[in-house]
């Protein structure tokens, strides 16, 4: 995790209407994502996650590159929860709220009884993951694990659910700096 920890030293923090937003290659794709950093993170996700599953589930947008790499290494099919509705049979919509926005997302190709692992870049306010977990639970999927690269320490909407996420690292943003816990 040396590369990930070092990359946080230079990560800019921007104010989005009072919300301290971390800008990082893993969670934003900017600055440019070094393949060695991506490789390190993906290997750690694979060592951490319960991968005895039928499908990997990742929310658009920044969970996609992580989950794609895990899917390629494990041959586990990937389901992307999209921000666009396609109107396909069985499509399930969910409403997500983050610290700085809210929108609809759409799940396709998850069936009752599917064992899934959710992989994402960041757990901050927990709004996205809480909504995804509720929707997957309503579908009848079995959420075997939730793994995020970074978790902002503090209250999260996920706290109000039965689901827990495992993070590779826990952080806070204090006075415009990232602090690793």
Curated annotation (Swiss-Prot):
BP terms from Gene Ontology: purine ribonucleoside salvage
Superkingdom to which the source organism belongs: Archaea
Pfam families: Pribosyltran
InterPro entries membership: HGPRTase-like, PRibTrfase_dom, PRTase-like, Pur/Pyrimidine_PRTase
Entry EC no(s): 2.4.2.-
Keyword Glycoprotein: no
Keyword Ubl conjugation tagged: no
Enzyme class per UniProt: transferase
CDD domains from the UniProt entry: PRTases_typeI
Keywords assigned by UniProt, alphabetized: Purine salvage, Transferase
Gene Ontology MF, one: transferase activity
Listed NCBIfam families: HPT_Archaea, PRK02304.1-4
UniProt record similarity statement: Belongs to the purine/pyrimidine phosphoribosyltransferase family. Archaeal HPRT subfamily.
Function, as annotated: May catalyze a purine salvage reaction, the substrate is unknown.
Name under which the protein is recorded: HGPRTase-like protein 2
Source species of the chain: Natrialba magadii (strain ATCC 43099 / DSM 3394 / CCM 3739 / CIP 104546 / IAM 13178 / JCM 8861 / NBRC 102185 / NCIMB 2190 / MS3) (Natronobacterium magadii)
Organism placement in taxonomy: Archaea, Methanobacteriati, Methanobacteriota, Stenosarchaea group, Halobacteria
